[in-house]
Amino acid sequence: MLKGHLHSVESLGTVDGPGLRYILFTQGCLLRCLYCHNPDTWKISEPSREVTVDEMVNEILPYKPYFDASGGGVTVSGGEPLLQMPFLEKLFAELKENGVHTCLDTSAGCANDTKAFQRHFEELQKHTDLILLDIKHIDNDKHIRLTGKPNTHILNFARKLSDMKQPVWIRHVLVPGYSDDKDDLIKLGEFINSLDNVEKFEILPYHQLGVHKWKTLGIAYELEDVEAPDDEAVKAAYRYVNFKGKIPVEL
């Protein structure tokens, strides 16, 4: 029986997509981001829970009144959810049959041009209302330094989503000294503005809320001395990216 490997769930999240959302955090990720706040999700073979589609749908549907009242739904995050597309295809299809908005939060670290990946993703996309795409860095060498992997396939995936006219929000973690260079942010903005499907751009300020997990796992945390960016740095980053010529009104 097809099962999903989960790390955890959050019943009423408010930051990973519109409205109130039930969030599934999947187990497994190919990236090794220096600032990852969930390093315990990296190994796909070590889930805290295995679930069937029916089990998950039965847990989610009691929250539908909250989704309907707030314009919310279900977001699958990670880890990297695209590592478990056969499970997500079935889950999202069932959720859509029940009138639930579906959202995928991905870094696309496992995206590739194989027929198998393309076939599964095209099926999943049929049942996906929104994708939150995390672009860690626009510069390939700096992306490797930050995540351990190149970004060429990730940018190609972003272009494919644009060709598919899939609604997307793009997010970028602002890490002082690593992903806050003015020229890089300008290039990031030029790339994002070249896509036709991006509805929203968000900067996520770096934080150290997950450092204790690195210590628990016995992994050295390289960014121990990096402080969170201040409000002015965040505002400057929005200006450099210049998404559709505007910055969020709350700034």
Curated annotation (Swiss-Prot):
Cofactor binding note from Swiss-Prot or TrEMBL: Binds 1 [4Fe-4S] cluster. The cluster is coordinated with 3 cysteines and an exchangeable S-adenosyl-L-methionine.
Domain of life from the UniProt record: Bacteria
Subcellular location(s) per record: Cytoplasm
Binding positions for S-adenosyl-L-methionine per the UniProt entry: Y35, C36, H37, G79, D134, I135, K136, H207
GO cellular component, one term: cytoplasm
Molecular function GO terms recorded: 4 iron, 4 sulfur cluster binding; [formate-C-acetyltransferase]-activating enzyme activity; metal ion binding
Binding site for [4Fe-4S] cluster: C29, C33, C36
Catalytic activity: glycyl-[formate C-acetyltransferase] + reduced [flavodoxin] + S-adenosyl-L-methionine = glycin-2-yl radical-[formate C-acetyltransferase] + semiquinone [flavodoxin] + 5'-deoxyadenosine + L-methionine + H(+)
InterPro entries given in the database record: Aldolase_TIM, BssD/PflA/YjjW, Organic_radical-activating, Organic_radical_activase, PFL1_activating, Pyruvate_for-lyase_activase, Radical_activat_CS, rSAM
Entry EC no(s): 1.97.1.4
Coiled coil region boundaries: none
Keyword annotations of the record: 4Fe-4S, Carbohydrate metabolism, Cytoplasm, Glucose metabolism, Iron, Iron-sulfur, Metal-binding, Oxidoreductase, S-adenosyl-L-methionine
Residues of the Radical SAM core domain: 15-244
Family designation: Belongs to the organic radical-activating enzymes family.
NCBIfam families cross-referenced by the UniProt entry: PFLA
General function of this protein: Activation of pyruvate formate-lyase under anaerobic conditions by generation of an organic free radical, using S-adenosylmethionine and reduced flavodoxin as cosubstrates to produce 5'-deoxy-adenosine.
Protein name as it appears in the record: Pyruvate formate-lyase-activating enzyme
Origin species: Staphylococcus aureus (strain NCTC 8325 / PS 47)
